[in-house]
């Protein structure tokens, strides 16, 4: 928002005369040295970097349709190692926030709770995504079986952390009244049994899941950035 002399809201104040101009600004920044490491790697393989994009932006761009970009949506990408919340409206990114919380944390939770290896834990997550359960409501892990209920309790606890993060981000952003298209979920983690449903039931907004924009050879929502 832009205000002229503390009272008048102006979409485009260029050319107006006033004593004071106010604006709400959200800055997204990254350490220059951090970016340089990536550009150096790209340069070493003989490629040039033409432009650098904010990762949540590219993920949203590769997933959302034009209507969502115009009318306003909260785009949540729950990936393998991080979760990003991107608030867009009128084809602009109004707010973006990322935390290191994703599928890998579900894996480590299962490792800790059931004292199993990382590969066994990852296999359980895969079975949850594919709904590969035993007839007696267990999940086979190597030579032993684990109660499906116990696994889902672990998944639910970690999902609640993500739900709270989304709520906190919406509150901090102050953009909680402009989303005609509600919340859109993407990323490989929402394929885990129960994750999407728990998030959808935690908000008054309309919540839906979405696949990346159709592209031949791309079916996994984990790679939505690649279509941009």
Annotate each PLM feature.
Residues 1-73, 94, 130-154, 173-176, ...:
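Nucleotide/phosphate-binding catalytic cleft detector across ATP-hydrolyzing
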Residues 54-58, 90, 99, 211-216:
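Short, ordered loop/turn segments at secondary-structure junctions
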Residues 100-114:
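A conserved active-site cap/scaffold subdomain adjacent to cofactor or substrate pockets
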Residues 42, 77, 110, 166, ...:
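Residue-level signature of catalytic and energy-coupling elements of molecular machines
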Residues 178-202:
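Glycine-rich phosphate-binding loops at beta-strand->alpha-helix junctions
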Residues 208-228:
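Glycine-rich phosphate-binding/hydrolytic loop that grips phosphoryl groups
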Residues 64-95, 110:
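Gly/Thr-rich phosphate-binding beta-strand-loop-beta motif of the actin/hexokinase/Hsp70
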Residues 163, 167-182:
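Phosphate/pyrophosphate-binding loops at sites that engage ATP/ADP/AMP, CoA/4′-phosphopantetheine
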């Amino acid at each position: 928002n832009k205000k002229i002399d503390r009272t008048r809201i102006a979409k485009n104040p260029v050319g107006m005369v006033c004593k004071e101009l106010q604006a709400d600004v959200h800055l997204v920044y990254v350490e220059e040295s951090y970016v340089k490491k990536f550009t150096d790697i790209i340069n070493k393989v003989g490629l040039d970097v033409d432009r650098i994009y904010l990762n949540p932006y590219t993920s949203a761009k590769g997933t959302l349709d034009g209507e969502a970009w115009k009318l306003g949506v909260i785009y949540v990408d729950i990936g393998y190692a991080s979760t990003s919340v991107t608030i867009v409206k009128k084809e602009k990114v109004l707010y973006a926030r990322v935390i290191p919380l994703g599928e890998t944390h579900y894996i480590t939770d299962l490792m800790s709770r059931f004292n199993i290896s990382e590969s066994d834990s990852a296999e359980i997550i895969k079975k949850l995504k594919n709904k590969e359960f035993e007839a007696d409501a267990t999940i086979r892990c190597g030579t032993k079986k684990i109660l499906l209920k116990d696994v889902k309790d672990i998944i639910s606890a970690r999902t609640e952390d993500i739900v709270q993060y989304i709520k906190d981000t919406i509150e901090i952003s102050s953009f909680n009244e402009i989303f005609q298209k509600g919340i859109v979920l993407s990323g490989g983690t929402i394929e885990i049994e129960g994750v999407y449903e728990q998030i959808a039931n935690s908000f008054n907004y309309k919540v839906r899941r979405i696949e990346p924009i159709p592209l031949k050879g791309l079916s996994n929502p984990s790679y939505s950035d690649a279509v941009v």
